[in-house]
């Protein structure tokens, strides 16, 4: 697993300090952007509510629970910047779960774009080129582990 620079860690921690206190609204911004960029992903969420307008889905309790879980994964990554390798098994399993529900690895890139969009919207002028790159570096490490889990899960499927 790759490592982040000390500057990357400092930038990520500093920006997450305020965002991490209010996870769900920031997560909703991220998922709103995700569904703008890749509307077909909305079909992967089979909740009891009709997700016809995207906003109905984004405000459903089940979906907000998913948003919370995603934001907690980001929080865990930020909390373990010095030892991201300790999250390896968790991230492998997360990749397997995403493969099992029909998420393809190309969608991970769109989630990354959506994360960066949320950071830009939330941080305003605090969103700088180096900050963007630091988050991208961390996200790349997280997604690499998830992709390995996704691939391993695919190997065990029989057609």
From Swiss-Prot:
Domain of life assignment: Eukaryota
GO biological process, alphabetically ordered: cellular response to hypoxia
GO terms assigned for molecular function: GDP-dissociation inhibitor activity; heme binding; metal ion binding; nitrite reductase activity; oxygen binding
Subcellular location as annotated: Cytoplasm, Cytosol; Mitochondrion matrix
Purpose of the protein: Monomeric globin with a bis-histidyl six-coordinate heme-iron atom through which it can bind dioxygen, carbon monoxide and nitric oxide. Could help transport oxygen and increase its availability to the metabolically active neuronal tissues, though its low quantity in tissues as well as its high affinity for dioxygen, which may limit its oxygen-releasing ability, argue against it. The ferrous/deoxygenated form exhibits a nitrite reductase activity and it could produce nitric oxide which in turn inhibits cellular respiration in response to hypoxia.
Protein family: Belongs to the globin family.
Protein name per UniProt: Neuroglobin-2
UniProt cross-references to InterPro entries, sorted A to Z: Globin, Globin-like_OT, Globin-like_sf, Globin/Proto
Assembly and interaction partners: Monomer. Homodimers and homotetramers. Mainly monomeric but also detected as part of homodimers and homotetramers.
Cellular component per GO, a single term: mitochondrial matrix
Catalytic activity: Fe(III)-heme b-[protein] + nitric oxide + H2O = Fe(II)-heme b-[protein] + nitrite + 2 H(+)
Entry EC no(s): 1.7.-.-
Main location: cytoplasm
Keywords: Cytoplasm, Heme, Iron, Metal-binding, Mitochondrion, Oxidoreductase
Pfam families in UniProt: Globin
Ligand binding (heme b): 66, 98
Signal peptide: none
Gene that encodes it: ngb2
Enzyme class: oxidoreductase
Occurrences of domain Globin (ranges): 3-151
